[in-house]
Amino acid sequence: MASSLTCTGVIWALLSFLSAATSCVGFFMPYWLWGSQLGKPVSFGTFRRCSYPVHDESRQMMVMVEECGRYASFQGIPSTEWRICTIVTGLGCGLLLLVALTALMGCCVSELISRTVGRVAGGIQFLGGLLIGAGCALYPLGWDSEEVRQTCGYISGQFDLGKCEIGWAYYCTGAGAAAAMLLCTWMACFSGKKQKHYPY
């Protein structure tokens, strides 16, 4: 099977896939922020949440429903900052996935990734990582929303966790973006083989 990638390019393709997968898994999982409410663990992502309070009519009290899900609508996301974070991080993950899948195809298809295409792919990865990094930086701005304050002991604010903790998915998303920006972008410059020029 012919490949359009150098040895460095094959490593770049695998690392691109790993960094994209890491960022995408972290983005999708609702474990960016951990807290508790009514004695039950609660976690948030950018567009998903685990455990939420509902009013139990039979007992006339608030109870926690312990399940994960998306917000009912885009407007249901607790803060404008988290809505922007969802869009920006989602775009970044999409770009990283696009480049990763193209790079993996370059392992099997000859003359798909030239040096120029590799450099352009590296630029796209840098942009994707930058967008995800911007999303991660925006996320703490939403910690002053009412839903988060209920979970974090009513003492959280922008860039102030209160009684909450940052979850593994936040770190996972950021680590994937950092790997894409720092390692993959650099390796992409050396990923493609020099194009052969045919005399005809």
From Swiss-Prot:
Residues spanning the signal sequence: 1-23
Domain of life: Eukaryota
InterPro entries listed in its UniProt record: LHFPL
GO cellular component terms attached to this protein's record: membrane
Transmembrane segments: 84-104, 123-143, 166-186
Keywords, alphabetical: Membrane, Signal, Transmembrane, Transmembrane helix
Pfam families referenced in this protein's UniProt entry, alphabetically: L_HMGIC_fpl
Localization annotation: Membrane
Topology term for the membrane: Multi-pass membrane protein
Family to which this protein belongs: Belongs to the LHFP family.
The protein's name in its UniProt record: LHFPL tetraspan subfamily member 6 protein
